[in-house]
Amino acid sequence: MRADKDLAFMLQYENIAWYNGGEVRILDRRCYPRKVEFVVCKTHQEVAQAIADMVTQSAGPYTAAAMGMALAAYECRDMTADRKLAYLEDAADVIANARPTTAQRMRLIVDGCIEAAKTAILSGADVSAAIVDHTIAMNDLRYGKVEKMAEYLVDMFPNNGGVMTQCFGETIVGQMLKIAKQRKKNIRLFCPETRPYFQGARLTATVCHDMGFDVTVITDNMPAYVMQNEQIDVFTSAADAICMDGYVVNKVGTFQIAIVAKYMGIPYFVTGAPDQGHTDVDTVTIEMRDPDFVLQAMGVKTACDGVKGYYPSFDITPPHLVSGVVTDTGIYSPYDLHRYFADGNMGEYRQSAPVV
């Protein structure tokens, strides 16, 4: 049984990104849920561009990247084995670097696909099919790990508690809600809208609603008021990177909510495995995106001509604002993340299942 069973529509593998017959279909999260549309990519370069263009985000690019590698394998299907591997290595570089801040994790994904391709080439199997099978196996593994994270996270939720989220944490949102439902924890969710793409309003809130929870969307300037007046018990987010020195890289706005949570005495739990590729915060590159997006809302211009925008995609939260890093094996202090790997863990995105 696949690990996406019983999760919301947009967390089903086929509705994230899927390779079939020489193309990759990616759910266009820029317009979901108002419209359910898929962007069709005919080349691996188009997959990389779709990732860069935010067609999919949060953990969506990791599935899209793997499916893009399946497409690259289709593109080079008639080449010799050596040329095929060289082509896939080049495709891996293009896809892994589609967005700079997440390049470390993306590299783990595409490298796993290359290992699956090598096995398929040696056995004479269909390389694209092998990469798709590998991706499903790795998604099942990752979803299973995130389900364990969710179990530890939901331990921190009081019955009938209030939980504030940030942006769209993808798999952890669905698994967190599934576990809360199983435990009959009747939590209320408050989702900051997350401008300029509105991931909180459109994606997180939709998943919460689809899974039967009481969910309220708030604007990005309301967290302090809501924490003060609506009985928020926990603030939680996923992370685009958790540095080994305890700094958390996530959607811009996370830092300011963490500051308010600390002031209010509300714990902030971040979910995800530490990133060994980010030994400290100085290894992080913050992606700067098109500032024009800040001057509009869902395509409607909100500022006059001549006004400038500013759009860092991520910010960095220091460890003293983090109550705990919730992993698949327990909750760690942000100051003691090396212990996660000392305990024998490999991380959320690192290949730790057999290549199929």
Where do the PLM segments sit?
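Histidine-anchored nucleotide/phosphate-binding helix
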Residues: 173-182, 258
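Ligand-binding beta-strand-loop-alpha-helix segment within the catalytic cores
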Residues: 105-159, 185-187, 191-235
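Glycine/charged-rich beta-loop-alpha catalytic/anionic-binding loops adjacent to active sites
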Residues: 30-33, 38, 42-52, 131-136, ...
